[in-house]
Amino acid sequence: GGWGWTDLSGAVPDADDTPGALLALSNLMQSGRLSDSQKERVKRASDLGVNWIMKLQNRDDGWPTFCRGWGKLPFDRSGADITAHCMRGIHAWQEHHPQRHRIQQAIRRGLRYLEKTQAEDGSWLPLWFGNQDNPGEENPVYGTSKVLAAYAALNLLETQPAQRGLRWIR
């Protein structure tokens, strides 16, 4: 059900590329350019992708990149950027998914994770895409931007965490 970062066979599905594929498919579905049979294929693929993402959510309410619950490798722990991207991806298909309530519950859990991991200054640190020019190679601009994009997609920019993030990024 998930998509990997390459078009070659044997790609490992991940929680960064799968939401990206879901967002692209959602835009394609809304384009008005698909036949009924193409729409059905896109819907089936999106259902599989949404289900894959939902099964990946960690007990801490966030999403890791590859494997649920491992936590031993850096990319298997939950990250704010990955969590936000997963939330956007599944939210895009919420109206079309047969288990809409599960998506809503997963998003609520993801929001809890984002609130728990927000830094005191209002920023969020990403799991991926560090900045070698920043001490510790952290990239709070990227992390905060990914999270704010999710808050915007969910119409939650007026919430306290989003407002703190917006103040930080300005």
Give the residues covered by each predicted segment:
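An alpha-helical repeat/solenoid feature that recognizes helix-turn-helix modules
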Residues: 1-112, 116-170
